[in-house]
């Protein structure tokens, strides 16, 4: 491998297999690359498949700055309720829903678009009192997590499968923290028949697309060939404005000093930006602050994450 393992830095676009937890995938890649510093962005349920962004090396510090938008292909089964809000759990209620039509369902989907209040599943990775909710639930301690506001940008109907327990296939584009299992449950409740998630594929996450993802077997093969397909930070963070520093400025900034910058337009306060050196090398993430009230174009670039 051309990259030194000790200085490896970047992201991998993993197609998570079904039956694996997100942590299982991280552990596998740690063993594969023989490094400890590996993390992931956006937990996927074990039964789900699709895009799982993997951060390698110091790129783990950049995970909070990746784009939040996610896209899913979800299949919802109606007439069935489970304790996990998917088919992996215990069935709590089951009944015929063969009277439902797409014409009945379509208008209800609008209630799930925009800023919506959502209660996460009782079986989830949310922490409460230092414990994951799924850990408590497995011990019989079912805790209803507090509701929270999430953003759903779009819901498109992909297919409809009528029957005793009809299934609805949707494309859902949303922000971080949105539980598709909760949408399945709540849609079923609105229809009065119950609902649960039958299948979930994440097609986009943190700017990475399923069409360009690689399986664990693909990654293992490419790693052995010395061709690990790392996505460099500049590309993964292309949604952020880039600010270039001169060599003296870069040295000071990397030592933790703020740098005064003059912009033709005022940048938003606290905006995160990519910071690069004059040769284009990625230095880290900075934050914009305004200090000169008389000239709001004069701002400072505060070190947020320094990688150089």
Swiss-Prot record:
One of its GO terms (biological process) is tRNA pseudouridine synthesis. Responsible for synthesis of pseudouridine from uracil-55 in the psi GC loop of transfer RNAs. Its EC number is 5.4.99.25. SUPFAM superfamilies: Pseudouridine synthase. This is tRNA pseudouridine synthase B. It comes from the Bacteria. InterPro entries: PsdUridine_synth_cat_dom_sf (IPR020103), PsdUridine_synth_N (IPR002501), PUA_sf (IPR036974), tRNA_psdUridine_synth_TruB (IPR014780), tRNA_sdUridine_synth_fam1_C (IPR015240), TruB_C (IPR032819). Keywords: Isomerase, tRNA processing. The lineage of its organism: Bacteria, Bacillati, Cyanobacteriota, Cyanophyceae, Oscillatoriophycideae. Pfam families: TruB-C_2, TruB_C_2, TruB_N. CDD domains: PseudoU_synth_EcTruB. GO terms for molecular function: RNA binding; tRNA pseudouridine(55) synthase activity.
């Amino acid at each position: 491998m051309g990259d030194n393992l000790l200085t490896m830095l970047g992201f991998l676009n993993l197609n998570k297999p079904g039956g694996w937890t997100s942590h299982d995938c991280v552990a596998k890649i740690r063993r594969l690359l023989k490094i400890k510093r590996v993390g992931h962005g956006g937990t996927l349920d074990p039964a789900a498949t699709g895009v799982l962004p993997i951060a390698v090396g110091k790129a783990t510090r950049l995970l909070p700055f990746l784009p939040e938008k996610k896209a899913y292909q979800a299949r919802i089964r109606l007439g069935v309720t489970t304790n996990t809000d998917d088919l992996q759990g215990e069935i709590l209620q089951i009944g015929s829903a063969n009277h439902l039509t797409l014409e009945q369902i379509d208008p209800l989907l609008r209630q799930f678009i925009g800023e919506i209040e959502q209660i996460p599943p009782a079986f989830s990775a949310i922490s409460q009192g230092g414990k994951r909710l799924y850990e408590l639930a497995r011990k019989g301690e079912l805790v209803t997590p507090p509701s929270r506001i999430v953003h759903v940008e779009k819901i498109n109907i992909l297919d409809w499968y009528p029957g005793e327990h009809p299934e609805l296939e949707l494309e859902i584009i949303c922000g971080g923290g949105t539980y598709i299992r909760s949408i399945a449950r709540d849609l079923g409740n609105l229809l009065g028949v119950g609902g649960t998630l039958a299948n979930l594929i994440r097609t986009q996450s943190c700017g990475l697309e399923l069409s360009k993802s690689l399986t664990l077997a693909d990654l293992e093969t490419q790693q052995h060939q010395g061709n690990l397909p790392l996505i460099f930070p500049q590309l993964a963070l292309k949604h952020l404005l880039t600010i270039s520093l001169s060599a003296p400025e870069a040295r000071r900034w990397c030592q933790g000093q703020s740098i005064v910058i003059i912009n033709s337009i005022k940048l938003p306060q606290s905006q995160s930006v990519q910071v690069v050196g004059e040769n284009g090398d990625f230095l880290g993430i900075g934050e914009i602050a305004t200090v000169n009230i008389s000239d709001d174009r004069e701002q400072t670039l505060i070190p947020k994450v320094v990688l150089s």
